[in-house]
């Protein structure tokens, strides 16, 4: 009897050890919804001053998951981006989780951490709205970047900066996003907008119009990624949009309109896609109408947005839905007055 109890106890201890030492599943990491609390410890002033690309420095990340599991391991971080690096209190960060000393976090690889421009209330609301745009596009297409919301506690190793906390989110790696859709990435590949998958590009163009984002370009690979069907070499690439902080839906204080559009505010919508035929427009507008309830519910159910901001966001989208309810207006915007080059 004592031997049986000892075997049972030993088994429980072993099972507990393996449970505690399991690596993070990178697919589940982005598929699950609960917020993660992360404490990021590094030399913050050094990171703020760094001007180079992918210049990594030592850091420690402690991640507390919704089930109260905690993983704390050494990582490295680097400032990234251009505009927000100059404008914001803390630049966007590239986190390298993979290393020999971080076996549990290593499967996450390198991920972009998107941070608000500051820890003030409005900055965080702006951050949450951009996060919601990614979630909105997830509702429309599997060929989209998944994101995971975090509450990040920043700790400076030299105590030059007082500890502070703010919302942030991690963006799925582009190669992982492609693989999830049976596709591959071809870094450096450049295509003209109309040389990509037409149906996908139609969906992307209307989405960018819906959120009023003029800060993208397919030929320049600016805020879009191309993914290629790995089982069909002759298939045209799919366009996947990202980086929406200059959109009218977000309406960040630092966002300015694309000069090419001739608008006075980022909230003024301009369709940047190419003309579509009326039968194509009927199909895509029906598709967007079918997603209205899910998109509205997503915003209404977001507990991190203030009621006033929720209302503004929904009103802004309702204006889009009002526009696409009129066939004549749709034809004028998405066909007659659309760009041709």
Ranges and model annotations:
Residues 1-23:
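Bacterial Sec-dependent N-terminal signal peptides
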Residues 21-341:
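Phosphate/dinucleotide-binding and metal-coordinating scaffold of catalytic cores
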């Amino acid at each position: 009897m004592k031997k049986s109890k000892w075997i049972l106890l030993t088994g429980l201890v072993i099972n507990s050890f393996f449970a505690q030492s399991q690596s993070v599943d990178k697919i589940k990491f982005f598929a699950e919804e609960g917020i993660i609390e992360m404490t990021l410890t590094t030399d913050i002033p050094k990171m703020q001053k760094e001007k180079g690309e992918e210049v990594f420095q030592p850091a420690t990340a402690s991640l507390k998951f919704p089930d109260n599991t905690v993983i704390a391991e050494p990582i490295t971080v680097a400032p990234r981006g251009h505009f927000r690096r100059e404008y914001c209190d803390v630049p966007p960060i590239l986190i390298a989780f993979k290393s020999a000393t971080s076996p549990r976090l290593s499967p996450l690889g390198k991920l972009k951490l998107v941070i608000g421009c500051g820890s003030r209330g409005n900055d965080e609301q702006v951050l949450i709205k951009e996060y919601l745009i990614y979630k909105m596009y997830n509702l429309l297409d599997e060929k989209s970047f998944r994101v995971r919301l975090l509450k990040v506690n920043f700790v400076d190793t030299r105590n030059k900066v007082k500890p502070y906390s703010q919302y942030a989110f991690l963006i799925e790696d582009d190669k992982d996003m492609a693989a999830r859709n049976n596709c591959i990435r071809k870094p450096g590949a450049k295509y003209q907008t109309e040389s990509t998958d037409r149906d996908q590009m139609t969906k992307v163009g209307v989405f960018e119009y819906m959120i009023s984002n003029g800060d993208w370009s397919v030929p320049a690979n600016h805020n879009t990624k191309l993914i290629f069907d790995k089982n069909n070499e002759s298939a045209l690439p799919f366009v996947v949009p990202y980086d929406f902080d200059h959109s009218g839906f977000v309406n960040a204080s630092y966002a300015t309109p694309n000069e090419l559009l001739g608008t006075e505010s980022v909230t003024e919508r301009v369709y940047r896609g190419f003309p579509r035929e009326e039968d194509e427009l009927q199909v895509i507008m029906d598709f967007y109408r079918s997603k209205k309830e899910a998109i509205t519910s997503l915003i209404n159910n977001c507990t991190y947005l203030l009621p006033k901001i929720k209302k503004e966001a929904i009103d802004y989208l309702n204006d889009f839905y009002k526009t696409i309810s009129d066939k004549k207006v749709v034809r004028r915007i998405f066909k007659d007055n659309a760009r041709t080059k």
